[in-house]
Amino acid sequence: MDERADQVVAVATEQGFPFWGAAGLMYRGWLKAKNGEVTEGISLLHRGLMAYRATGAEIQMPTFIALLAKACDIAGGIDESLTLLDDALQIVERTGERWLAAELNRHKGQLLLLQGHFVAAEELYHKALGIAREQEAKLWELRAAASLARLRRDQGRRTEARDLLAPVYGWFTEGFDTQDLKEAKALLDELGGA
């Protein structure tokens, strides 16, 4: 994957496609951050994001900002991640590019939960769940339901947690080897049933 990101950057630079060159830089940065080279990854993500903004493009901007936020999470920069997610959510509202809205809200909820803001986190999980259901985006719905179920479990509301997550998990007929479904299944097993 890293080689492909390098190829995108090389071809885009050679052919004069700044949009694709910037996107390639951001994907390269995300891969580096995800694979432990966090400082270099964040630097590449910032460079790519600046280059992308310079093209005037806004499509996929929330996605790229979310990648930078995740890299900042890895580095322990929760406050920076929250600022980035707020920026991405503002772009979603302004442009109507809502396909990632549920995941952005869920991610923000996770970070607020880490800071001890339980009520705000729960509200964002509910918002993410509502958006995912409205869009019929089952993966985002699963992630939001799992996050909310974990919170409810931690609050001692195990039956509610199971009742929330079980039907969403039950919708899936394949992909059970994916990380999201494995984690949902493990949580359901812990809660007493799938």
What are these regions (language model features)?
Residues 1-194:
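Helix-coil-helix junctions within alpha-helical repeat/solenoid scaffolds
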